[in-house]
């Protein structure tokens, strides 16, 4: 799996480098510096790491999270808002097509993530886990996974968990290729 991750990531970075540059310039023009952000996420065995993303929300948007909790349309573990006021106008398409996730290829190179696996969550979200949810931390988190190809916008963490466990229990290189 690691060899596949390294091979596909290297290939992806080479092929997609012009797109990286275009997105970088686009976000810089729209909202200025700090185009690539680092977010604290929880990975394999609960270890924290810095996950890279193209910034599609205004600077310091994470500080507004507590003020917006009443708008959260998801269950207690997932925090997402439809028409989130923190999103930079003009970057919705980056989010809709997961282009904001492209810098995570660097996390894969560092061995913190895999191309396929459960989505890495914020530390504060994993503190809301009950014991059964901790099982999803037994594998490297991924850029994409069963959830993203089946029910990307689901509002229930139990659905996330269902797909994560299905992936963990049925993992094979064939399944990874099917997901990719």
Please give the residue ranges for each predicted region.
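A hydrophobic, helix-centered structural microdomain
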Residues: 1-62, 173, 178-180
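C-terminal terminal-structure detector
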Residues: 82, 132-180
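A short, structured surface patch at a secondary-structure boundary
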Residues: 77-139, 180
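Short glycine/proline- and charge-enriched loop/turn segments
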Residues: 69-74, 129-130, 162
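Active-site/binding-pocket entry motifs
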Residues: 57-64, 152-156
């Amino acid at each position: 799996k690691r060899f596949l991750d390294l091979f596909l990531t290297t290939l992806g970075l080479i092929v997609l480098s012009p797109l990286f540059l275009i997105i970088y310039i686009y976000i810089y023009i729209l909202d200025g510096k700090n185009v690539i952000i680092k977010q604290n996420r929880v990975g394999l065995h609960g270890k924290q790491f810095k996950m890279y993303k193209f910034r599609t929300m205004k600077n310091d948007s994470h500080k507004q999270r507590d003020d917006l909790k009443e708008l959260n349309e998801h269950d207690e573990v997932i925090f997402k808002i439809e028409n989130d006021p923190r999103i930079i106008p003009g970057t919705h398409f980056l989010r809709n097509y997961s282009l904001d996730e492209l810098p995570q290829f660097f996390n894969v190179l560092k061995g913190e993530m895999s191309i396929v696996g459960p989505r890495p969550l914020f530390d504060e979200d994993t503190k809301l886990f009950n014991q059964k949810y901790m099982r999803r931390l037994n594998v490297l988190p991924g850029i994409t996974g069963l959830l993203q190809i089946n029910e990307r916008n689901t509002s229930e963490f139990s659905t996330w968990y269902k797909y994560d466990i299905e992936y963990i229990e049925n993992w094979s290189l064939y399944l990874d290729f099917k997901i990719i």
